[in-house]
Amino acid sequence: MDCLFCKIIAGDIPCKKVYENEQVLAFRDINPQAPVHVLLIPKKHMKNILECDGETIAAIQKAIVKVAELEGVAADGFRIVSNCGENGRQSVHHLHFHLLGGARLTEKMA
């Protein structure tokens, strides 16, 4: 499989890890759009949210809470974004969520 995020999970491509558990990996975005910009991905490959099962989405939700706390954005707020499909502008076809925060974000959907 030629998936960028699967290669990161396998350790073939380095990342700046923020958090990891059995099901989810969270790491810093290489092109941050906010002072805090972390990607959260399931370790099991799935193309997008349409392929995600309940157990995986629950694990991602718990990881989002943990990362928001670790990054110090839980109290003041943050944004979660997941693009799905071509019209949703999904660029990497492995389910992922962007956690953005660390400053007052613009109204523009990032």
What are these regions (language model features)?
Residues 1-110:
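HIT superfamily nucleotide-processing domains
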